[in-house]
């Protein structure tokens, strides 16, 4: 019988195993805060980004975003990324949206969304809005 050929396994040096990876992109959505009173209440989420990738202006950043800004960012990504399918955001919540468990579920959904989007190579290299949304306190969505 023919012997199946296996790819050659390269041994890593200790330096390679413990060296800083070539591309780091870590995104966390943390620290939700609810603001306002009554009908004017809303929740913001802190986006913490750590990277060494050249497509981002800052290696470490932290910005706050409302869900409505995530929606605008999502729409902008869909318009500029014709070849990439943009994953959906966690759904709109109309009742009891300020309960801790509801806010935590949304936080997790927003974090997963950002990690998927930011991890896509075409979006990383071609998006005009990704780094701005993740890093710029002055992010201004276009209509």
Swiss-Prot record:
GO terms for biological process: endocytic recycling; intracellular protein transport; late endosome to Golgi transport. InterPro entries: PX_dom, PX_dom_sf, PX_Grd19_PX, Sorting_Nexin. PROSITE patterns: PX. The keyword Membrane applies. Keywords: Cytoplasm, Golgi apparatus, Lipid-binding, Membrane, Protein transport, Transport. Its main location: cytoplasm. GO terms for molecular function: phosphatidylinositol-3-phosphate binding. It holds the Pfam family PX. Residues 23-140 form the PX domain. CDD domains: PX_Grd19. The keyword Protein transport applies. It is a peripheral membrane protein. It comes from the Eukaryota. A 1,2-diacyl-sn-glycero-3-phospho-(1D-myo-inositol-3-phosphate) binds at residues 66, 68, 92, 97, 106. One of its GO terms (cellular component) is early endosome membrane. Belongs to the sorting nexin family. Required for retention of late Golgi membrane proteins. Component of the retrieval machinery that functions by direct interaction with the cytosolic tails of certain TGN membrane proteins during the sorting/budding process at the prevacuolar compartment. Binds phosphatidylinositol 3-phosphate (PtdIns(P3)). PANTHER family: RE52028P. The PX domain binds phosphatidylinositol 3-phosphate which is necessary for peripheral membrane localization. This is Sorting nexin-3. The gene is snx3.
